[in-house]
Amino acid sequence: LLDLFASREIAATFFIPFGPDRSGRAVRRLFEQPGFLRRMWRLGAPGRYGLRTILSGTLIPSVPIGSARPDILRSVAAEGHEVGLHGYDHVRWQDRLGDLTPYEVALELEMASRAYQGIFGQLPRASAAPGWRTNERALLAQETLGLHYASDVRGRRPFWPVVLGRRLETLQIPVTMPTLDEIFAWEGPERRGPERALLGALVPGSANVLAVHAEIAGGSALPILREFISMARDRGYSISRLEDLARDVLGSGEQLPSCGIGLGR
């Protein structure tokens, strides 16, 4: 991904989990989420994710993700990209957030923030919830981090989140587009032209936000992402970091909506 972005002179935003890689424990979703196995089969998960990811935290011991390679993270920032939080224990947050106490939620965020500070020597300015999973406890705990913005949800446009009747001060910039792995798992002709499916999801004049997972877009799907970037630019779209979008939104004087956050599928 870094090579692609450098060749296209793109500055992007990277959200990194800083705790253990326990991806293999996501196997419980086979029993808890109807259709999960079918989606993984259509996605071709072993080939796209690799056995290291699929077995990590089960048959293969967990290793830290961001914290294990501070040199890589510093090189990402040195190339002009933004680096933000993507939780601490990604699988625990994504699968068990609703069971965590307010203290446990705050601790997950605090551990990620401390790891970030240990690498970059400064406080994080942005966060994206693992699996777009959030709730009232998480949003309230996140308020204490002093973030510039967060990207915790799927939606249509930037907004101020409302919790228990209170408008929070951390701007939300939602992901507006489908991800590549979602497109791969869809039925129908989109699978034969995923870059065109992405192109069709762009809304002219809007803040389009695309999330790409490094293990997919930086691997077997890299040619698809490369082609999508070319097609989008040919149609006049520019690509920037989310922190630049947040600064533009906050500096525009636009009256942003205040919205509650609900569970989607």
Q: Which sequence ranges carry the predicted segments?
A:
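Catalytic alpha-helical scaffold of carbohydrate-active enzymes acting on polysaccharides/glycoconjugates
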Residues: 1-126, 131-171, 190-210, 217-265
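Positively charged, amphipathic and often flexible ligand-engagement surfaces
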Residues: 157, 172-189
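Short Gly/Pro-enriched loop/turn and capping motifs at secondary-structure junctions
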Residues: 178, 215-218
